[in-house]
A protein has these predicted regions:
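Short coil/turn linkers that connect adjacent helices within long alpha-helical scaffolds
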Residues: 4, 50-54, 91-96, 132-136
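TPR repeat positional signature
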Residues: 7, 14-17, 21, 40, ...
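Residue register of alpha-helical TPR repeats
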Residues: 12, 59-61, 102, 140
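"A position-specific structural signal for the A-helix of alpha-solenoid helical repeats
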Residues: 16, 65, 99, 106, ...
Length: 155
């Protein structure tokens, strides 16, 4: 199981299967599904770190996914920890564009979950100010920003 190609395959599967649950309306996610979603997101992060071709973008995206999962679960403290790591990876490795926008989206959502509307709005503005070259990537970021939960913070 130490084959980097195998880790990559499992990371992709775990990441995509996390979205099978995350894509559901929050009110429809059961307690068991929330636990399963969390396990899948951590599994994805674990396998990405050992995957063939692993780089800072994989690391940042794994942290983003963990932040999103914890925000959906209503745990802002844990969500914020992963969001901070996501943003730190972007800033320390020069990731911009899509990844930097998502890092700010994660920060915004985690702050919103914690009830800090001012910080949430600041990071939403930062996410919106990131230049994203690919129109499809921009549409994906915008779609995710439009998705719940925002805990009463307007996007």
């Amino acid at each position: 199981m130490n084959e980097p190609a195998t880790h990559r395959k499992i990371a992709i599967e775990a990441n995509n299967s996390t979205w099978e649950i995350l894509a559901k309306p929050i009110a429809e996610i059961t307690t068991d599904e929330a636990e399963e979603m969390t396990r899948r997101a951590y599994a994805a992060a674990y396998h990405w770190q050992r995957a063939e071709g692993f780089g800072p973008a994989n690391d940042a995206r794994a942290e983003w996914l963990l932040s999103r999962v914890w925000a959906v679960r209503g745990n802002g403290e844990v969500a914020l920890g992963h969001a901070r790591r996501c943003l730190s990876i972007c800033e320390s490795t020069g990731l911009v564009d899509f990844d930097l926008a998502y890092a700010h989206e994660a920060m915004a959502r985690a702050h919103a979950c914690l009830g800090d509307s001012a910080a949430a709005r600041q990071h939403l503005e930062s996410a919106g100010n990131v230049s994203i070259a690919d129109p499809q990537d921009k549409a994906q970021v915008d779609s995710d920003i439009a998705a719940a939960p925002w805990f009463g913070v307007e996007q």
